[in-house]
Amino acid sequence: MDDIERRAFMKGAAIGALAFTVGGTQVLLTPRQAHAQNVPLRTLTPEQAATLDAMGEALVPGAKQAGITNFVDQQISIPAEQALLEARIMNVRPPYASFYRAALGAVEGASQAKYGGRGFARLNAAEQHDFIDLMRQNKLESWKGPGAGFVYFLLRTDAVDVVYGTMDGYAQLGVPYQAHIAPTRSW
């Protein structure tokens, strides 16, 4: 983040922007903007990204377009102490990339076992919701990875964060955006 001036960073942070690397240069973009601009992922594979996009969209409609995969990928690519992920709050042991790889692998493995080799992104909406319901209840017999209910909770929280954790998200809900602790003066 040395390439980004502090003032520009703080202004970007106020609108939910994160530092993404585009063409070798760090720029401030929201996850939605990063998704729209097809910013290359740094850590997740295309298969993991497809699973995360599909899972996020099934959990919270609009999560894919809001950039859930770009958000998670950016967050697991930075030092753990800087991450804004719920995984950090829930004391998941860093590196967070290991947790997300295992979680997304477990989703894929359980989906393929239950649905004849089809990964989660290839399921129809009803199958995805059935799978998520079983996942939420820890009832997927073929699940191999971090606890299914815990993975459900964290992926749902990530999806909610990118869709509704912004000023635009608050506006969608018809809720006035108010900072929890507003600064007393400009920094």
Which residues fall in each region the model found?
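Residue-level marker of structural boundaries
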Residues: L18-A19, Q137
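Generic structural signal for individual residues within well-ordered alpha-helical segments
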Residues: R7-M10, H129
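Sec-dependent signal peptide hydrophobic core
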Residues: A13-A17
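Flexible, low-complexity segments enriched for small/polar residues
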Residues: V39-P40, A49-L52, G56-Y152
